[in-house]
From Swiss-Prot:
SMART domains in the record: ZnF_C2H2
Name of the protein in question: C2H2 type master regulator of conidiophore development brlA
InterPro entries given in the database record: Znf_C2H2_sf, Znf_C2H2_type
Protein function: BrlA, abaA and wetA are pivotal regulators of conidiophore development and conidium maturation. They act individually and together to regulate their own expression and that of numerous other sporulation-specific genes. Binds promoters of target genes at brlA response elements (BREs) containing the conserved sequence 5'-(C/A)(A/G)AGGG(G/A)-3'.
Length: 433
């Protein structure tokens, strides 16, 4: 009978369906399974591919109710349906009995992850770290040692579409952090387990937050507390002026009908100037700046008052000097202007042009000088050109009185009474041609 059982075990091909078996009957989930017994660094993985053939887990003599079995090298590989799609998060994933292992049987996480040995500092889990919260408000959860198997299986499985998504295996993405107090949080979403995954230098101090401590955001206007103003020293008056608003002025948050309007800001500016301790120099400059517009306005008002018709004299002084010539309406303010005007009526023209051939006479000397500059000092004109009257000529000499050459240049030493040699009597019209 014994030999017959051994022959049967030699020909036995074991097919394990963990979906039909409970978590206590699964060979990979029994308390007697130890990762140290496996000859490979990664024993049978829950996240392995379609079929899994472990070279050593079924060789253990106590893996199934203490019945010894011998492994055939030519037998069909052990097939199992250990797909994450068949394992629910609350059935096999969250209640794995790996946490019941002895302290000496547990190993550091980098020992199970040979591909991540360079990141030992990030994946090391201290053994003396507390596993649960000590606060009575937070529910108790299992220890963190069960994540050794989860992390080992998670990092060694390929990313395939048929397995459980990352949100179910990642403890930070499975459930929200804040839940109701009566609802029990799953093991993958506990704050204690997440703290074990954090590095030691970034781990936070565990704190318990009850729903009663969470206060809703105030919807009404918020006024600054009175204690914030009592903290400032009273002996320094400048601190009071630097506060953004006075205690009696409130600011509405979220409502357009707040008191912080442009009108209130304008009024607050005056309060700021009154409360601010100005230095004498600064105050004097401010006063001068405010006085300047008033001075300008007073000057403008004075000019407007002077231009008004009421301030003008009632009688305008008439021109005293009138021309006595019948039919002439000339009036002058000065006597000499009237005298010069009377010469035009008397036909007296004592001022005559000295240029030979030009005999024009003028009653006034200024008219004669204008005749010189406008008539004889320009080339190409109808009148004779005189070089002594041209300011641009090298022969310019306004005091010269004498004979001129046909081109208008002066003949020094000659007089106006002398006749010009070999020129005959020439008219002004001939010179112009």
């Amino acid at each position: 009978m014994r030999s017959h059982g051994q022959q049967i075990s030699d020909r036995l091909t074991v097919e394990v369906d963990c979906h039909s078996l409970g978590p206590s009957e699964c060979p990979s989930m029994t308390s007697s399974f130890s990762p140290l017994d496996s000859p490979t660094p990664t024993p049978t993985s829950l996240y392995s591919q379609g079929s899994m053939a472990s070279p050593g887990w079924h060789e253990h003599p106590h893996y199934h109710h203490g019945v010894p079995m011998e492994r055939r090298t030519s037998a069909t590989p052990l097939r199992s349906a250990f797909r994450m799609a068949d394992i629910t998060s609350g059935d096999a994933m969250m209640n794995m009995p790996c946490g019941n292992m002895d302290r000496q049987d547990q190993m550091a996480l980098p020992d199970y992850l040979p591909a991540y040995e360079e990141n030992v500092d990030q994946l090391w889990i201290p053994q003396d770290m507390p596993k649960t919260y000590q606060e009575p408000q937070f529910p108790y959860h299992a220890s963190m040692s069960q994540y050794n198997q989860m992390a080992r299986n998670y990092y060694h499985r390929p990313q395939q579409a048929g397995y459980l998504p990352e949100s179910a295996s990642n403890p930070c993405l499975s459930r929200p952090i804040f839940t109701q107090p009566t609802e029990r949080m799953p093991n993958s979403a506990s704050m204690t387990n997440m703290l074990h995954w954090m590095p030691s230098h970034e781990s936070l101090v565990p704190q318990t937050i009850t729903p009663a401590q969470v206060q809703p955001f105030p919807s009404g206007p918020v006024t600054p507390p009175s204690s914030s103003y009592s903290d400032f020293p009273t002996n320094i008056p400048t601190f009071k002026s630097h506060t953004p608003s006075t205690p009696h002025r409130s600011v509405s948050m979220g409502t357009p009908s707040g008191s912080d309007t442009p009108v209130s800001r304008m009024s607050g500016h005056n309060d700021y100037q009154e409360e601010f301790q100005l230095s004498p120099v600064y105050r004097e400059g401010m006063m001068q700046r405010h006085r300047q517009p008033s001075r300008k306005s007073s000057k403008k008002q004075l000019l407007r008052s002077n231009l008004s018709l009421e301030n003008l004299p009632s009688i305008i002084k008439q021109v005293q000097f009138k021309c006595k010539e019948p039919g002439c309406k000339g009036r002058f303010k000065r006597q000499e202007h009237l005298k010069r005007h009377m010469k035009s009526h008397s036909k007296e023209k004592p001022h005559v042009c000295w240029v030979p051939g030009c005999h024009r006479a003028f009653s006034r000397s200024d008219n004669l000088n204008a005749h010189y500059t406008k008539t004889h000092s320009k080339r190409g004109g109808r009148n004779r050109y005189v070089a002594t009257l041209d300011e641009t000529s090298q022969d310019f000499d306004p005091d010269f009185r004498g004979q001129l050459t046909p081109d208008g240049r002066p003949i020094y030493g000659s007089k106006l009474e002398d006749s010009m040699p070999d020129c005959g009597e020439l008219s002004v019209d001939g010179w112009d041609d």
